[in-house]
Amino acid sequence: MISDNLMLNNDKTEFLIIGTRQQLAKVNINCIRVGSTDVCPVTVARNLGSWFDEQLNMSTHISKLCGVAFYHLHNIKRIRKYLSRESTEMLVHAFITSRLDYCNSLLYGLPNYQLNKLQRVLNASARLVCNAPTFCHISPLLRGLHWFPVKARIEFKILLITSKQFTDLLLNICAIY
């Protein structure tokens, strides 16, 4: 690596062993040596803004995402009385829904109890934008804002990525002929 002018950043280098609980119990790796550096395994690693854990159940990613989202919701709620509905919606899109939509295709197939945590964030965001009471029915608010539920947002993102790939493939084929 040194001959290629590459060096590891010791503070950021980590590795993750992925498997089921039973598989992880059988593995006993303390550290691996890369060049002159010992790299020890971690239970959670961050890559491109997503948190991955040993069992790939995304629980760490979801809990950190919910924590950050509720923090921003709290801050927006403090200044809500000074904002119009449109500005509140813009802030919610900038700070909350953009985070919910980032890498959400990784969440496809997770159990409902995991996705319900993200749905609570989306529901609280809709209530904040519409200035609705805490216990009002959420479906009309989401419909009025034209927001999909979390599970539908994930499926929509996957369909969008797939259709873009097919469109690009067709354009490349048409360019050949």
Residue locations for each model-derived region?
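Hydrophobic/basic alpha-helical segments
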Residues: 1-177
